[in-house]
């Protein structure tokens, strides 16, 4: 059973703005916001003000820490060389087996 040979299920809903029932040139619709919601505007008197910081003092910065001490890099230790040789041997062994 192929889904390509079946008729469409239905007509898609109408697209676009505004939806049916709203006049095209009226936004927001009449009666908005619904009753019970306060009208938006300025905050009430006494609301904490979010102004600029006080002038005359620099803003606080994070403390400055000295850079970490640099470690002297030693020459490669024998452990590194032994690890490389072991990996090389493993690769050769696997290559010989497979």
From Swiss-Prot:
Cysteine pairs bridged by disulfides in the record: none
Region (Disordered): 1-77
Predominant location category: membrane
GO biological process terms held by the UniProt record: megasporogenesis
Stretches with biased composition (Low complexity): 37-55
Keyword Metal-binding: no
Gene knockout outcome: No visible phenotype under normal growth conditions, but flowers of the double mutants wih1-1 and wih2-1 have defect in megasporgogenesis. Doubl mutant plants display retarded growth, and twisted leaves, siliques and roots.
Record key words, sorted: Membrane, Transmembrane, Transmembrane helix
Tissue: Expressed in floral organ primordia.
TM stretches of this protein: 75-92
Superkingdom, natural source: Eukaryota
Designated name of the protein: Cysteine-rich and transmembrane domain-containing protein WIH2
Organism: Arabidopsis thaliana (Mouse-ear cress)
Lineage: Eukaryota, Viridiplantae, Streptophyta, Embryophyta, Tracheophyta
């Amino acid at each position: 059973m192929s889904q390509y040979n079946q008729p469409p299920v239905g007509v898609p809903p109408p697209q676009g703005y505004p939806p049916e029932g709203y006049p095209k040139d009226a936004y927001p619709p009449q009666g908005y916001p619904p009753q019970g919601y306060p009208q938006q505007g300025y905050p009430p008197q006494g609301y904490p003000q979010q102004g600029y910081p006080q002038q005359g003092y620099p803003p606080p910065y994070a403390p400055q820490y000295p850079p970490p001490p640099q470690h002297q890099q030693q020459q490669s230790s024998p452990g590194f060389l032994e690890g490389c040789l072991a990996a090389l041997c493993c690769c050769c062994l696997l290559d010989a087996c497979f």
